[in-house]
């Protein structure tokens, strides 16, 4: 496969892929492009920031607010978790009533003798998987 990048400040960004058939690679390129195009507005105090969906490690509901957690920041989002579930792609999984994680940002799982499963993300954030979601997560991740 050949790759060609043309930088022209006067053009609108566009990705064109020529392929004989749809493959896992072309699907991955499509997913990356679509996710980078999706953005949310997040707030830190009174300042608003654009956040790409692909930058988000997880969404957490706390104290009647929803937060998007990225590698270095925590943004308040003016949407509910159920609304975010409709916006994000298949790389996000709801692990409990108050947390949706990006599976691409999972560093590891910690399990205890009592059967509790904890997800640890690459940025250090961790949360517990509810018992009813353990089976779903294992199936989705092929564990």
Q: How would you label these PLM feature ranges?
A:
Residues 18-19, 78, 127-130:
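Active-site-adjacent beta-strand anchor residues
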Residues 19-20, 71, 97, 131:
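Conserved residues at beta->alpha junctions
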Residues 12-13, 39, 136:
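Long, contiguous, secondary-structure-rich segments that constitute the structural scaffold
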Residues 24-31, 132, 136:
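Long, highly charged amphipathic alpha-helices
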């Amino acid at each position: 496969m050949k790759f060609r990048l043309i930088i022209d400040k006067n053009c609108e960004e566009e990705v064109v892929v020529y392929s004989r058939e749809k493959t896992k690679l072309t699907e991955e390129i499509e997913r990356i492009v679509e996710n980078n195009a999706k953005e949310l507005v997040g707030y830190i105090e009174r300042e608003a920031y654009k956040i790409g969906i692909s930058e988000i490690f997880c969404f957490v509901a706390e104290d009647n607010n929803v937060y998007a957690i990225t590698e270095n920041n925590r943004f308040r989002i003016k949407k509910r978790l159920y609304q975010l579930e409709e916006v994000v792609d298949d790389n996000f999984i709801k692990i409990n009533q108050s947390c949706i994680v990006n599976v691409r940002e999972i560093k590891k799982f910690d399990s205890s003798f009592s059967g509790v499963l904890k997800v640890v993300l690459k940025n250090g954030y961790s949360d517990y998987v509810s018992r009813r979601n353990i089976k779903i997560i294992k199936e989705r991740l092929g564990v």
